[in-house]
Amino acid sequence: MRKVFLFLIGLCALSLSAQVTTEPNPIPVGYTGTFKIIFDPMKGSGGMATATACYAHLGYCTATQSWQGVKGSWGTKNQPEFTKRTDGKWEYTINNMFTYFGVPETTPITKLVMVFHDGNGNNSKEGKGAGGQDIYIVLGQESVGKDLFHLFCSVYS
């Protein structure tokens, strides 16, 4: 039993290393302030590990709709461009998500959704979640790697 418990603790520790984090973390529901999205290209699918540029196909979700408010076209350089940090991660600042997406502050934004690319059109490198899925930041929840193991850790730790 002790070995199983230690194994599960180890899995929890691994899952706390997130592919995408935010500052502040969490971003509150209805937040109108400035926040940063920080992307670690070495995690998740790892498809952007060697990229020299980083753009995001970035949108928002409500309870009933996904991928709303996306700027530009997939794979192009007319999407939000992230800045490379000295630690190898990529960063982007949004001053007010409602202004950014061009929607009223009464819009019930529940999540931000994103996929990263290097801006090379149909040949773009792609940064997604570990299973190849889109990346979601749930507003009001810490962005520390929302996988099954993290869910287990948050419930049982």
Regions found by a protein language model. Give the residues of each.
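Insoluble glucan recognition modules
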Residues: 18-157
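Bacterial Sec-dependent N-terminal signal peptides
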Residues: 1-22
